């Protein structure tokens, strides 16, 4: 894979991460996560098939994470404009904070690079890894647990009632798993798998609603 193609994919992942930020309040466009996370996972597997370097896997996760956090935490820099003594921190909020948080996404991908396969077992492994590193993000260095992707469900009080039984981070794991389930329908687009994945994701949501 050429450097030009790799750079293009990193840029594309930045855009995917930014698009995922629109699933959070006040937009709550939750459907975009089914696209962004499935493509994210698809590109991880594609890099494995192309035998990319280990460092490339880190930057795959980092690019997606940076796009997500840079877009979803814009309000932090805006809040610093109300006090002139704090305006020097605006570049830190815009650039530094998303970089620090995106490292966890990069680490989550590189931690599982040797296990990458084009199957549902890897979907489970990916979901576990990313949810674990999201948990670490919430507890290390005083913690910064804002903007978990599971916050996408906050538009519905009924959906988040499940937190009572499984907690925030298990809920985050389930969210990542459900959002990424279509990745295996993309080699090439396979309508049979799309139907199976649609049935699976709808069944999960149905069981979810029965529980709550």
Put a short name on every predicted segment.
Residues 2-212:
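Membrane-embedded alpha-helical bundles of multi-pass enzymes
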């Amino acid at each position: 894979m050429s450097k030009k193609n790799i750079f293009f994919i990193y840029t594309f992942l930045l855009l995917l991460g930014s698009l995922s930020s629109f699933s959070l309040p006040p937009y709550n466009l939750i459907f975009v996560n089914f696209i962004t996370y499935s493509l994210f996972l698809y590109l991880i597997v594609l890099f494995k098939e192309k035998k990319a370097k280990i460092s490339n896997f880190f930057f795959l996760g980092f690019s997606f994470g940076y796009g997500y956090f840079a877009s979803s935490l814009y309000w932090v820099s805006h809040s610093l404009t109300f006090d002139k003594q704090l305006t020097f921190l605006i570049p830190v909020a815009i650039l530094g904070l998303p970089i620090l948080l995106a490292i966890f996404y990069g680490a989550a991908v590189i931690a599982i690079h040797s296990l990458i396969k084009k199957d549902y077992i890897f979907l489970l492994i990916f979901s576990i890894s990313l949810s674990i590193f999201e948990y670490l993000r919430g507890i290390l260095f005083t913690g910064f647990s804002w903007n978990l992707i599971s916050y996408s469900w906050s538009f519905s009080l009924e959906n988040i009632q499940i937190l009572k039984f499984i907690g925030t981070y298990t809920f985050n794991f389930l969210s990542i798993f459900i959002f990424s389930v279509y990745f295996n329908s993309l080699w090439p687009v396979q309508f049979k798998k799309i139907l199976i994945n649609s049935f699976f994701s709808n069944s999960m949501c149905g069981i979810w609603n029965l529980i709550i």
